[in-house]
């Protein structure tokens, strides 16, 4: 074979190998051809899988609003392609938000040193947060890690939102039972635009008539005012405001303090008890 012939054969084999590599590289994403994860714990999903996850988790969380894992999955499945990027861009457009994205802090019982928070001044953000956790019987260590958002930076944004959620509870004083969660989710929806926070409001149908009336007349109007008027909560560097007065922080964020749900329910129970006692006395 001539030099020219050998060169042609080599080039043909190289072209064939390159074509095979390109075909392999461009093979469409499917269940049988799942790309490698973009970060530890990441689970890439097809469009069909993402839709099924969103539908299944939405139905499951409506049936049982206490399933935090389903609510987390719903949040991730519905956050892309637009909403989580909008939230990430809101952080990039803010000096504090950019620092949070650069530092990547995590909120856990170890990083916050809960023992120290309980020694802070009574009305400080840190003490308020610790008292709220103790009262509600929850821990900052219970938040699931993000796994269904493809973009690594956006995955952190979702993780940050998830871990900051209890701070929102603490500064507003809202409890974790359904009535309090819905009030906070309404505020979060107007502040973050994450679909999951809006979809969570469908749990309204499971509330008792008195709770529905209370929500519509007291806490929904509060959530609308505070949600539309407040600053982007994702840009609060909570680790740096732990010693700040909580009333001062609410004023800076332009968030009103909502009616105390626990106190309202306590008063209603007392009224019902007195009414029952009066009825018993009347029957005797």
UniProtKB/Swiss-Prot annotation:
Subcellular location: Mitochondrion inner membrane
GO cellular component annotations of the record: extrinsic component of mitochondrial inner membrane
Domain of life: Eukaryota
Transport in keyword set: no
GO process annotations (BP): ubiquinone biosynthetic process
A matching Pfam family: Coq4
Main location per the UniProt record: mitochondrion
Its job: Lyase that catalyzes the C1-decarboxylation of 4-hydroxy-3-methoxy-5-(all-trans-polyprenyl)benzoic acid into 2-methoxy-6-(all-trans-polyprenyl)phenol during ubiquinone biosynthesis.
Protein name: Ubiquinone biosynthesis protein coq4, mitochondrial
Species of the source: Penicillium rubens (strain ATCC 28089 / DSM 1075 / NRRL 1951 / Wisconsin 54-1255) (Penicillium chrysogenum)
Gene assigned in the entry: coq4
